[in-house]
Structure formats: C-alpha cells, structure tokens
C-alpha cells in the first residue's frame, strides 16, 4: 500500500510541532519528502522514521 502524502501543515500537526519546523526539516533534508507539483509532501511513514531517529 502506498504511503499517504501529507502537506507540511498536516505533518506538523501529527508530529506536534509548528509547520515552520517541518519546513525546516525538509529544507535540511532531515525528514524524507516527495515533491509533487513543486510542493514538498511528507509520506506518513516518514513521520515514524523521523520519530525513531529523533529519540
């Protein structure tokens, strides 16, 4: 099954951090993302990967 692609605001809500923090993670390539029509989307399974590395 394909991972759900989340906009930065939804990824931030699920991580419990500000949207700017998710955008910073994308910019610094500290979280996996996919570009769709020029907009970065975070796969929902990348949130768990990030949580595992951040702890």
Language-model-derived ranges and their functions:
Residues 29:
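Glycine-centered, phosphate/nucleic-acid-interacting loop/turn motifs that mediate DNA/RNA or nucleotide
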Residues 12, 25-26:
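Hydrophobic alpha-helix position signal
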Residues 1-19:
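Polyanion-binding surface elements
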Residues 5-10, 32-55:
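Short helix-start
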Residues 1, 26, 35-37:
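Short, solvent-exposed coil/turn segments
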Residues 21, 25, 50:
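Residues in the recognition helix of alpha-helical DNA-binding motifs
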Residues 19-20, 44:
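The DNA-contacting recognition helix of HTH DNA-binding domains
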